[in-house]
């Protein structure tokens, strides 16, 4: 049965008050604090109906009501409908004019989001196949040092510093750049391994002494490109919530953040917009008391990762949805502007 306007107002009042106080709320409090225009008795009857319909819960017989997961879901869906139709403008000045390591930019935005929201944030970095490597560049920084730069077809950059056992003439770098791009960029993992194991040393000739460093660095870059990295920030914010004053419950939360495989599944994008999972909607038992707000970030419209906020079900969904929406749009714009062109 759909909720009428009166029930909606009462449900929103209960949720708003509970988010602020973490205490069950009664009909008299709603009548006094919120301009609903109904008597305490009428509100009490409506709250009983909302409880029977599954939108509210009564933790103790003598206490007021608190929102259920179903109640939060109704509230969140109404917020998301507004955001689909009315995207807020980007307002945070967090842009940098330098090209930075991709992962570090994402981590910075996750850190900013944690500081703004006072919640724990988690970020998922992209997992890529070797044949997504678009370009390799060796940049000399000294006679015995070079930067090994990998650029993927989405523009994501990885860089590594190579310390060589001997000095290298700078004229060799053009040869190396051409060779590595010909043999690695756009090639399958099998072809790359065959080149490294069978051909590289021979092709380097008298420069074979740098083969070990190159092979180790290339293998490391391939390994890291295929790994899904999970980053968490603002982990201590959970202790600010009364629900997590219990040390056992707090410990379980920190153990959850250490479970990277679980977080990897939690952050797997399921919709191409803001996705909210509330309490029992989460498929993992460890997250039945938590809510997750997550959304993807993109490079030129292509999804490359996910950022999420994790906290108690009693969270300010309207504020947090707004914050994560703005921050991921800003992050996507920044990444697209930095990695739009070839380096």
Curated annotation (Swiss-Prot):
Recorded GO MF terms: DNA binding
Entry keyword set: Repressor, Stress response, Transcription, Transcription regulation
Keyword Transcription regulation: yes
Record carries keyword Transcription regulation: yes
One Pfam family in the UniProt entry: HrcA
InterPro entries attached to this UniProt entry: GAF-like_dom_sf, HrcA, HrcA_C, WH-like_DNA-bd_sf, WH_DNA-bd_sf, WHTH_transcript_rep_HrcA_IDD
GO biological process: negative regulation of DNA-templated transcription
NCBIfam families recorded: hrcA
Family, similarity comment: Belongs to the HrcA family.
Protein name as annotated: Heat-inducible transcription repressor HrcA
Annotated gene: hrcA
